[in-house]
Every structure is written in C-alpha cells, then in structure tokens.
Amino acid sequence: MSASETSSNHPPRVRVAPSPTGDPHVGTAYVALFNRTHARQGGGQFLLRIDDTDRSRYQATSEDQIFHALEWLGLNWDEGPDKGGPHAPYRQSERLEHYQSLIERLMASGHSYRCFCTADRISELREDQKANKQRLGYDGACREISAEDSERRARDGESHVIRLKVPNSGETVFKDRLRGEIRVSNAEIDDQVLIKTDGFPTYHLANVADDIS
C-alpha cells in the first residue's frame, strides 16, 4: 500500500509505482494485485505511478511494457500517466517543480543541506569504514558549512547533492500497523541524499512526497 491513511471514514487510496528500468517483474504484479484488491473492496482508488527518477537506468520502452503487462493481468488502474486524475502528473520526472518546492522548505527550515563531497571521497569513506568495521554512512563533513558559503559554492556551479539533516541525538518514533511502535536512534540514521547532482530527487524524497500528496 501507499503511505495514504485508510480508515472506515476514508476509502483506501493505494498505488503501484514501478520504475521503467527494464522488463516488468513479478514484484510489480504482486503489489498491483494486492493493492487493487484492497482498493476495490474498500471502495477506493488504485493508482499507477511511474517512478522514473533514476535517469541512468531509465529505458524509454519500459513504460509501455509496464502498461501492457498490468493490462494483460487485468489489473486496471483508476488514475495514471495515460488516464490523468486529480493529482496529475503521475510521472515523477514531470513533478520536479513540486520536489524543488519541498526542498526549498527543508533548506529554509534547516532540515536539509548541500553536500559538496565528490563521489571519490564518498567511496573512500565507505572503504575506510569497512576496513575499520565501522557503521557505513555519511560522516557529515558538509553539515556545518554556512548557508552563505553553501549558496556561493552552488552559484559558482560546484557539483553537489542535497541531504536530509538528521538530528545527531534523540530518536525517531513511528507506529507500524503490523509491528506497533518502532523506535530508532537518530545516530543510526544516515543523512540520506534527497536531490542528486542531476537535480532529480531520490526515492527517499519523491516516494514519500507523492504518497502523502
């Protein structure tokens, strides 16, 4: 299911969100089957969303293959790229302005930051962590760069990503429908990349943002 809340007062609104990076696989059919059934039984909607933010693996023909595979299985959708709907567009590559507005809010509130570390540095960091049997993850080297310096470097064209700024202390708590209350120390949560160097969002941002909306 998606992150959309369902209850007796709100019909379920669920989705399947495959990535057009190759041939359709059984996982897509599995999710579509269960979510479509859930939507139909609850009088809700079943959506098809195309998660096409991984441009390095994107295959133009894969989207049509996804459509045909789901139609062949009889798993028709109510809203999607080919049908439209009240929350269009349903391709993530066509929603970049929406993600950018969210990032601007996160940056302004201090919940995200630009990271100028090169791919080589990140690779070396991970190798060092493996060699020293340390927890893998970003070391926060760019967390304390001033806003002025960060903006200047970005204006100068220096390559960067935008990361989530996870608090150094405390814990994150949420309720899982199956497992109940889950508590995770913030020290164990990585500063995940939200926007890549090409300006496209990662799964961590786009998937959550679209499920909520």
Specify the residue positions occupied by each region the protein language model found.
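N-terminal Rossmann-like or analogous alpha/beta NTP/dinucleotide-binding catalytic cores
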Residues: 2-131
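Active-site cores that bind ATP or allylic diphosphates and position pyrophosphate for catalysis
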Residues: 113-213
